[in-house]
């Protein structure tokens, strides 16, 4: 499957982010692959700590691919896993038709009891 483009670029998901990591630390690390257009760290409302993942957007597929291809990333002694956040679904081959009879040729079903009941006053 191919990475899907968002409105403005390509979004990667980074998992394994340390709960005390800051946006600045994450952005500094991932700026090595190209300018970061957007960065989102989801925080736990109760604790205020990072929930363990980040979404990072790059302008080009090449920049995002460099980040995904890097296998030795870590931050605050936590190993990071990186992948594309959105993928395009695979193209489907057209399905062969099961029936050769068109719907307009289907036999007409009559409901005599219902027709009689509806005709009565």
Swiss-Prot record:
Instruction: List the biased-composition ranges (Basic and acidic residues).
Output: 109-121
Q: Which UniProt keywords apply?
A: Cytoplasm, Nucleus, RNA-binding
Q: Where is the RRM domain?
A: 10-87
Q: Which GO terms describe its molecular function?
A: mRNA binding
Pfam families given in the database record? RRM_1
Q: Which residues cross the membrane?
A: none
Location of this chain's protein in the cell = Cytoplasm; Nucleus
Q: Does the keyword Cytoplasm apply?
A: yes
- Compositional bias, Polar residues, is annotated for 97-108
InterPro entries referenced in this protein's UniProt entry, alphabetically: Nucleotide-bd_a/b_plait_sf, RBD_domain_sf, RNA-bd_8, RRM_dom, RRM_RBM8
What biological process terms from GO does the record include?
Answer: mRNA cis splicing, via spliceosome; RNA splicing
Instruction: Keyword check for RNA-binding, yes or no.
Output: yes
CDD domains for this protein: RRM_RBM8 (cd12324)
GO CC terms of this entry: cytosol; exon-exon junction complex; nucleus
Primary residence: cytoplasm
Region (Disordered), start-end ranges: 90-121
Question: What name goes with this protein?
Answer: Uncharacterized RNA-binding protein C23A1.09
Which organism is the protein's source?
Answer: Schizosaccharomyces pombe (strain 972 / ATCC 24843) (Fission yeast)
